[in-house]
């Protein structure tokens, strides 16, 4: 029962991490305008994400434009795209494997493959969380380095957007949930197709012979020397 509760908790955390990873991938709030220097008072803010860049006006109007060229994008943005897409795909595969492998489901019940699916789902969640963590950490490091670069004008500096914070939280949930899924299957006994033989039955013990009454041994006695002599044959003939 305890391992089932751990599996449910791990799956719930991992599922929340998967949803957060999807939202992080879609949102354009990876970089936002840094209000420093001459940009302290401005009516326009710029947002940059993996797929589009947006302009936010003080009137509450958003204007977004999708990146039209893939090769014109910087390499760090292309790498972040690839990592986040792979992370989302792995999270979906991990969710399917975990549903099959959990004890509370009927899929593959009573087979050794059920535990294998649960461990595989946990491992895929771990890998997905790691890829998401690498992507958001790489982008955060790039934003911080550009922000403290004195050669860069203040109009080209950006701050950490809300999507990066969500990415850190989502990747942490995926890592924790995947770890719980893997640990919940660690203490289970291996599958055996036949019931194990008891220790008492494995050792052979000598059993006493069955009791027979004395009358049963009367006909089994060997003939005496006297009876053999009276039968017409002498014992000396056989020597």
From Swiss-Prot:
Residues on Extracellular side: 29-81, 137-162
Side Cytoplasmic, residues: 1-7, 103-115, 184-239
Primary location group: other
Pfam assignment, any one: PMP22_Claudin
InterPro entries referenced in this protein's UniProt entry, alphabetically: Claudin, Claudin_CS, PMP22/EMP/MP20/Claudin
Localisation: Cell junction, Tight junction; Cell membrane
Tissue specificity: Expressed in all sensory epithelia of the inner ear vestibular organs, as well as in liver and kidney.
Bilayer-spanning residue ranges: 8-28, 82-102, 116-136, 163-183
GO MF annotation, one: structural molecule activity
Keyword Methyltransferase found: no
GO cellular component terms, A-Z: bicellular tight junction; plasma membrane
Lipid bilayer topology: Multi-pass membrane protein
Family under the similarity heading: Belongs to the claudin family.
PANTHER family xref list: CLAUDIN (PTHR12002)
Function: Plays a major role in tight junction-specific obliteration of the intercellular space, through calcium-independent cell-adhesion activity.
Listed name of the protein: Claudin-14
Species of origin: Mus musculus (Mouse)
